[in-house]
Amino acid sequence: MTLALSTYYRTSLNRGETMTTVAKEIDNIRAYLKIQLVMHDNEFRVVEQISDGLNDYMIPKLILQPLAENAIDHGIDVSDNEDPTLWLTIREEDKHIFFEIRDNGAGMTQEKADQILTYQSSGYGVRNVCDRIHVLYGEKGEMKIESTPGKGTRVFIRIPKKTEAKVL
């Protein structure tokens, strides 16, 4: 737990940096999820599907943690699912990197999911990630939320592969 906390804080503190590598973002989300598993007495599972060869690409810092936090707090924690699971997928396709956080928790209506990205909800963590994706990548970046009540939620991010940081 101590190692997970120190890793999480080390990778989260921004030191003025808005970009990080995929490898550091993976370290951050793994540390965050370890902390959450301890806090939840391992009452949910985490399944990772991470492609090789992506470690050195630059991405916006802290794009996965808010998504995982919402999946746990608003999906897994409030679900009656007997096998609560959070899936973390990172893969590449052509000139893009795809990130997905998915849960089999409570879910929500698609209308409510759409409102999260259009300033019609009170939350700001997920919307902040969406805003940063649009500022950094414009039409080349994308974030979508798909959800079904009682089935779970899938948050999907697509960004171009970059090896140099564009500063916000």
Predicted regions and their residues:
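C-terminal beta-strand of the catalytic ATP-binding
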Residues: 157-163
